[in-house]
């Protein structure tokens, strides 16, 4: 009897210990070893001489960035998923930001404050997420990843990033409601380093690797996914130089037999040329070709987003040309971004096969197009 009680007690003790261990390692519990409190000391950061200062500021150890476009890079960190929290007092007249999943200045994810909007919680572009791809910050190609936020200069602001696979939530001063919800991180990397830039102070940096607070790692829903009106497939030429001031005419149309490559649109119907061709050091252009098979003659309306300049030819005749260059006064709404709101034009289609040739030029940040017809009924997009 005593032996039976002993065995039962032993098994019960093992079971309780096992349950306790499972509880300690559950996803909702953060092991102490997983929380990285990053010291604001020079030995933990890589930076250019005299560009960063480490000090006590408002009673907390802080890092002060003294020079714009001179990131302070955290040493010995390979971050993929998890939570990043920090306090920031922005002083930059332009932007204060954090890079993550950073493998170089040319490839990383970037979240930033437009500090000119500090104190204006209704500014539509107060904060933005944008990746840097092939050396190009895609702020002008992804306007749906910006939004309002309540933050201020001359005081601490608390920022929390929750990053899980393809998704990210950004909290600013209010930890109950995200200021930005990013359904798909658009950068090329799944892991990398972390850095800060922009004049101002950084303090209380805490990183919790793999603590994602239940955020799904899967890509979120594309609001245009079920909309058949977008022209999501085209053929693409290679880029060629286009001297400043030169406009495209019918004499510039590509010749029969020129090499073409198939290109599929990204989320929201964006034909993103930056991801393929990278930065334009000087003005250059690419041709996009779309073939439409039409049952009967009809006129359609095209909602058209573009960056920077476009020339649209229908069946070898110039139909539409426009510019969306960020500098005023020729930038398009919304504020020079590539958006379906940029422009629209009539598209007179003949019965049979119609060929659209779209010249796209670029010499400033991102480039690409978005095209959506008012209806695709009676129209077939040919491969």
What are these model-derived regions, one by one?
Residues 53-70, 82:
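Short carbohydrate-recognition loop motifs
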Residues 69-134:
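Secretory/extracellular carbohydrate-interaction modules
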Residues 135-158:
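Short, aromatic/His-centered strand-loop micro-motif at the edge of beta-sheets
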Residues 152-181, 309-319:
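Carbohydrate-binding surfaces in secreted/extracellular proteins
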Residues 173-191, 319-331:
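Short, solvent-exposed beta-strand-to-loop segments that form ligand-recognition rims
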Residues 186-224, 338-348, 355, 369-372, ...:
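Ligand-recognition surfaces built from glycine- and aromatic
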Residues 208-295, 364-383:
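Extracellular/secretory pathway-exposed regions associated with glycan biology
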Residues 299-313, 356:
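Aromatic-lined ligand-binding clefts that engage carbohydrates, nucleic acids, or primary amines
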């Amino acid at each position: 009897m005593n032996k039976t009680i002993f065995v039962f007690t032993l098994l019960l003790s093992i079971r309780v210990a096992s349950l306790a261990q499972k509880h300690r390692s559950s996803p909702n519990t953060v092991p102490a070893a997983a929380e990285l409190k990053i010291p604001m000391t020079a030995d933990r950061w890589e930076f250019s001489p005299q560009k960063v200062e480490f000090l006590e500021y408002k009673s907390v150890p802080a890092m002060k960035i003294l020079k714009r476009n001179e990131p302070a890079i955290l040493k010995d960190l390979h971050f993929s998923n998890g939570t990043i929290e920090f306090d920031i007092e922005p002083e930059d007249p332009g932007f204060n930001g954090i890079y993550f999943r950073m493998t170089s200045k040319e490839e990383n994810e970037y979240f930033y404050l437009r500090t000119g909007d500090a104190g204006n919680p209704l500014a539509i572009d107060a904060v933005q997420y944008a990746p840097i791809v092939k050396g190009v910050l895609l702020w002008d190609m992804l306007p749906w990843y910006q939004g309002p936020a309540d933050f201020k200069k001359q005081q601490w602001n608390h920022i929390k990033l929750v990053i899980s696979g393809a998704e990210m939530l950004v909290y600013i001063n209010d930890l109950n409601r995200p200021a930005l919800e990013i359904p798909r991180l658009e950068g090329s990397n799944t892991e990398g380093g972390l850095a800060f830039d922009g004049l101002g102070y950084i303090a209380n940096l805490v990183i919790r690797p793999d603590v994602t607070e239940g955020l799904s790692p899967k890509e979120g829903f594309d609001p245009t996914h079920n909309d058949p009106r977008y022209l999501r497939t085209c053929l693409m030429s290679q880029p060629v130089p286009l001297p400043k001031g030169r406009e495209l005419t019918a004499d510039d149309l590509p010749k029969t037999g020129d090499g073409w490559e198939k290109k599929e649109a990204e989320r929201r119907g964006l034909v993103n040329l930056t991801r393929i061709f990278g930065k334009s050091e000087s003005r250059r252009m690419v041709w996009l070709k779309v073939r439409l098979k039409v049952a009967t003659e009809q006129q359609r309306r095209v909602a058209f987003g573009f960056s920077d300049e476009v020339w649209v030819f229908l069946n070898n005749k110039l139909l539409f040309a426009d510019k969306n260059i960020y500098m005023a006064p020729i930038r398009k709404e919304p504020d020079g971004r590539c958006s379906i709101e940029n422009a629209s034009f009539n598209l007179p289609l003949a019965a049979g096969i119609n060929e659209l040739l779209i010249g796209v030029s670029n010499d400033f940040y991102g480039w690409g197009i978005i095209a959506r017809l008012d209806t695709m009924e009676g129209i077939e997009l040919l491969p």
